[in-house]
């Protein structure tokens, strides 16, 4: 355990941020899974709604630095490809 006041604060801050990042990443994964299940069931309307939600979460995660912007873009592209496959 650190003795210096600023180091103690850093430990608290890092723990708080770690928890927030984990929660946001978990929500992101859940949103993507909701899309995947809707797409697997062939439900186009639910898939479209889930795609919008997943896209928002991916963009937000990329903006916050949680995931790389190219990774977010790649995931969105793959999801969009699946969605277009359902519609066609």
UniProtKB/Swiss-Prot annotation:
Which segments carry the region annotation Disordered?
1-22, 69-88
Whether Transferase counts among this entry's keywords is: no
Pfam families named among the record's database cross-references: Ribosomal_S20p
Q: Which domain of life is it from?
A: Bacteria
Q: Which InterPro entries match?
A: Ribosomal_bS20, Ribosomal_bS20_sf
- Keyword line: Ribonucleoprotein, Ribosomal protein, RNA-binding, rRNA-binding
Instruction: Choose any GO biological process term that the UniProt entry carries and state it.
Output: translation
MF (Gene Ontology): small ribosomal subunit rRNA binding; structural constituent of ribosome
Report the GO terms under cellular component. cytosol; small ribosomal subunit
The question of whether Ribosomal protein is a record keyword is answered with yes
Tell me, in a sentence or two, what this protein's role is: Binds directly to 16S ribosomal RNA.
Family designation: Belongs to the bacterial ribosomal protein bS20 family.
Which protein is depicted?
Answer: Small ribosomal subunit protein bS20
């Amino acid at each position: 355990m650190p003795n210096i006041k600023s180091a103690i604060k850093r430990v608290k801050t890092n723990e708080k941020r770690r928890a927030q990042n984990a929660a946001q990443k978990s929500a992101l994964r859940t949103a993507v899974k909701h899309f995947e299940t809707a797409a697997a069931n062939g439900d186009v309307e639910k898939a479209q709604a889930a795609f919008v939600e997943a896209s928002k979460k991916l963009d937000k995660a990329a903006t916050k630095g949680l995931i790389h912007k190219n990774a977010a873009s790649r995931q969105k592209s793959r999801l969009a490809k699946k969605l277009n496959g359902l519609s066609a």
